[in-house]
């Protein structure tokens, strides 16, 4: 059976309020950490979410 290349990651809010999103990414083709602008429902604004383990 083939080894999975996609891994589940957590994107945590940069405000530190504890909100996070889960997604998957291909670790082989994108080894760097992801930074995305997404909506934070706690503060009701779009902010930067960063990947953490």
From Swiss-Prot:
The lineage of its organism: Bacteria, Pseudomonadati, Pseudomonadota, Gammaproteobacteria, Enterobacterales. This is Large ribosomal subunit protein bL33. GO terms for molecular function: structural constituent of ribosome. GO terms for biological process: translation. HAMAP family: Ribosomal_bL33. GO terms for cellular component: cytosolic large ribosomal subunit. It comes from the Bacteria. Keywords: Ribonucleoprotein, Ribosomal protein. Belongs to the bacterial ribosomal protein bL33 family.
């Amino acid at each position: 059976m083939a080894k999975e290349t996609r891994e589940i990651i957590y994107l945590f809010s940069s405000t530190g309020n504890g909100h996070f999103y889960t997604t998957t990414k291909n670790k082989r083709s994108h080894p760097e950490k992801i930074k995305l602008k997404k909506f934070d429902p706690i503060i009701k604004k779009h902010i930067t979410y960063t990947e953490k383990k």
